[in-house]
């Protein structure tokens, strides 16, 4: 399944069958290398919160384990993001920029390979974020990110969606080797990308954004 260039799709994170977050994105390209998406600053988004209205990262994981959740809509308050999901890979790469639009680094999001869906009116890709990440600077030096959260959650195997710690770390090391070598996509590709001016920022999540996950 391929997505048409310019189409608005939803990129969703799924946790044990529940939607964790939703971000609408425009398709820049979709080919044998993978899927390239653009998330505009200020886009309408949604994220899972507990009964107190707090997101998962705002509380200890032990306190997050409650049967009461809801999806809260809001705005993407981070920088505009370029997201590349390599075909068949267990990670995605995000290009970060500063307020002036200058490239500041690559964020490697370790995740289970995305599963696509297309309902006709709306399409998307569902991933399972594995929480451990890698930050790669423009000079290709790097560091692990969110390792504390990753280790904390591994202590709750009956509730956590990551089942193979070694595989996650191995994927991270594999991508780190690519970055250190300056190989694609850490070779300067897309660092100066600018979206077409006609691509409007999604002010509302498209109908069907909360359809049941496919994974």
Across the structure, where does each feature detected by a protein language model lie?
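Charge-rich, low-complexity N-terminal segments
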Residues: 1-79
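A generic local secondary-structure boundary/capping motif
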Residues: 15-16, 25-26, 121-123, 132-133
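Short acidic-glycine loop/turn motifs at beta-strand connectors
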Residues: 30-33, 99-100, 136-139
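Short, well-ordered strand-loop elements centered on a beta-strand within folded domains, enriched
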Residues: 35-39, 102-109, 141-148
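A short, polar/proline- and glycine-enriched secondary-structure boundary/capping micro-motif
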Residues: 46-51, 119, 153-158
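Structured beta-strand/loop patches that form or line metal/cofactor-binding pockets in enzymes
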Residues: 78-132
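A hydrophobic, small-residue-rich beta->alpha segment in the mid-to-C-terminal subdomain
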Residues: 130-178
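Cysteine/selenocysteine-centered motifs that mediate thiol-based redox chemistry or coordinate metal-sulfur cofactors
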Residues: 170-215
